[in-house]
Amino acid sequence: MGKKSLAEQIADIANKPQVEDFDIENDEGVFQHGGSDSDVSSGDESEEELKKQHYVAVGKSKLRNVVDQGLAVKDKKYVGSKGSRAELFNDEEMDAPEQGESESEAESGSEESDAVSFRSDSEDVSESEATSESEIEKDREEDEETAMKKEKLAKIVQTQTKQVINNLAHSAQRDASKGYAILQQNKFFDKILDSRIKLQKALSASNQLPLSQQSWDELLDENNSKLLTSTFKVLEKVLTQCVTVRHKFQIGDHINQSENPSDFDNSKKRSFKELVHETVTLDSDLKSYRSAVLNKWSAKVSASSGKSLLQASKFKAINQSADVQVDNQLADMPRLLKRTKLNRSNTKPLLFDEDLQKGLLKELQLEENVEGDIEEENNLDIPKNYDPRRKDNNALDFTQNPYIYDDEDFYRVLLNDLVEKKISNSQQSNGVTLAITSRSENKLKKNIDTKASKGRKLNYSIQEPIANYEASVNTGYKWSDEQIDEFFAGLLGQKINFNEDDELEADTMHNEEDEEIKNDDIQIFG
């Protein structure tokens, strides 16, 4: 094969693959591929040699010669210290007790060698035994001290565990007593609500009683009088029992500190007025104690819940103490009393209309408003409580009756709380909730006509008939019958002549003129 040209050599170099291909059937190629590691290593060495070809040959440095010859250490700190064999053996015995056997074997070998070394070895052994005994005693003492410390620690731990158990038991007992007291309070409150619910019917029925003494006398008979006397006796008995219980309770809890238990006489018979007076005094004595208790427990509850830390919301009514909330609710007493006089159930006392007509119900009469508006003073025919939106504008508005007591809104709130509490206790797993809504017929709604706006309907009220009224009579001047007849005839467009003679003469003259006209011999139109 001839020599390749320059172009062929350049083409071979350019077309040479980066990864060399190996033929499987070529054994030499496979063998060369298997020994590629050695070739690579030899190639690396040759590459390193090629890299160092330009280096200049340099001999060893002075430091290297010193290291090869060995360092001549002349400083004292590098010189070792001499020691005896006894010290060496003592150190070895302290480090490991098993080395004693090897030392004894070495000592026996040394005794066979020479007597001088035997004497020195025996002295060393005696010294080591003495030191070992002292160390054993020290170890025993240390073990005893550690045992004593452990016993003391165990006793301290036992006493502390007993104290913790006792504290837990006392805290559990306190918590149990508090829980029992709360349960008893809830039961007592439920009983009070139950009695209040039972009294609601009697309270609503009492609003139907007569209002005046005349109606009482008219409706009262023997059976009713007997029933009244019996109920009055029962009421006095219940009031006396309530007063005695409250006296015992307040004296026992040191609420009434001025009184003694012996000063209160249960056997003394009191009148109804005296019982009412005693209840008022008991309420006044209980007020300060109640406010203190409410303030105490509300502060504890707010501290446990973290509400006291929220300074931004302390002025809200719900974040104030319980006694302050109660005082705020009772501050506007006229408004609360006015709400109790609203006739929500539309009850009407017996003989109410008769008493109203007779003027026996003074509180329901219309009062003159001296500071009224000028329009009301000018329009005297319009009642003061006139409302054009109402369907029936009577002179009196009976939706607010001062002779009744109706707290149905407060009663329904209590009833709703009681029922929700019962349901939550009995059916917690089911999560059943009940919302009690008052009936629409029991709600107080104003009788307003919604179609009377924008002039679509003209509302009016019929004026009541005026009593004891008579038109004035002027006796100074009277009309005659002729004037009256002429006046009414003139209204109807007629004219009446009351002179009959003149009328007859006029008739005769008229007849004569007619005859003369007929006989005048003048003929018109043929």
UniProtKB/Swiss-Prot annotation:
Give the start-end ranges of region Disordered. 16-53, 82-149
**Any coiled-coil regions, as ranges:** none
Q: Check the record and name the InterPro entries matching this protein.
A: AATF, AATF/Bfr2, AATF_C
Q: Which GO terms describe its biological process?
A: maturation of SSU-rRNA from tricistronic rRNA transcript (SSU-rRNA, 5.8S rRNA, LSU-rRNA)
Instruction: Specify where it is mainly localized.
Output: nucleus
Q: Which GO terms describe its cellular component?
A: nucleolus
- Which stretches are tagged as biased composition: Acidic residues? 89-114, 123-145
Official protein name in the record: Protein BFR2
